[in-house]
Amino acid sequence: MKKPYRKISDYAIVGGLSALVMVSIVGCKSNADDKPKEQSSLSQSVQKGAFVILEEQKDKSYKVVEEYPSSRTHIIVRDLQGNERVLSNEEIQKLIKEEEAKIDNGTSKLVQPNNGGGSNEGSGFGLGSAILGSAAGAILGSYIGNKLFNNPNYQQNAQRTYKSPQAYQRSQNSFSKSAPSASSMGGASKGQSGFFGSSRPTSSPAVSSGTRGFNS
């Protein structure tokens, strides 16, 4: 099987820890299958993954600034000072479970109408909701997809988890290029807003993939 390689230019927009992690992901598939039974169903799809960079905003919320298809799922958090760290699988699972509870009781920003109508800085997505609005959320949180799949508020708010329309479009384009392999795995091939709308094996209602959800 051919290993995926990226052009050097693909890494120009990410730096520091995120660039090092991305290079290690692309150049070496190695540890993806080292512990096949260790992880729960929450993260069993990790090798059908996404490389996601979340950036802290001034209001302590988080936005997706970059994401790419990857053999494994890695989520990097960049703080206001530019420091980066990789979230552990345990941290990711905890964040998703906490966000699931908020979805169940209706307090998640992902399912609230128009997310309060705030601006990019004021939209208030925490780490959990930012993760579930990204490609990684459709993979790691696929087991709660039914709770979001037909939710029109989620479909709009998922776009708002991205820092800009350009970041969202880069993600769309990046995953579209890998659509054959992603679709064969039931993964996150993306032609719709909200990754839960395209990660399911059954057909899903069409949703606009424009930039309607962004406020500047």
Curated annotation (Swiss-Prot):
It is a lipid-anchor. Belongs to the UPF0323 family. GO terms for cellular component: plasma membrane. A lipid is attached at residue 28 (S-diacylglycerol cysteine). Residues 1-27 form the signal peptide. Keywords: Cell membrane, Lipoprotein, Membrane, Palmitate, Signal. The keyword Secreted does not apply. A lipid is attached at residue 28 (N-palmitoyl cysteine). The keyword Transmembrane does not apply. It comes from Helicobacter pylori (strain G27). Residues 159-216 are annotated as: Disordered. This is UPF0323 lipoprotein HPG27_212. Residues 171-209 have a biased composition (Low complexity). Residues 159-170 have a biased composition (Polar residues). It is found in: Cell membrane.
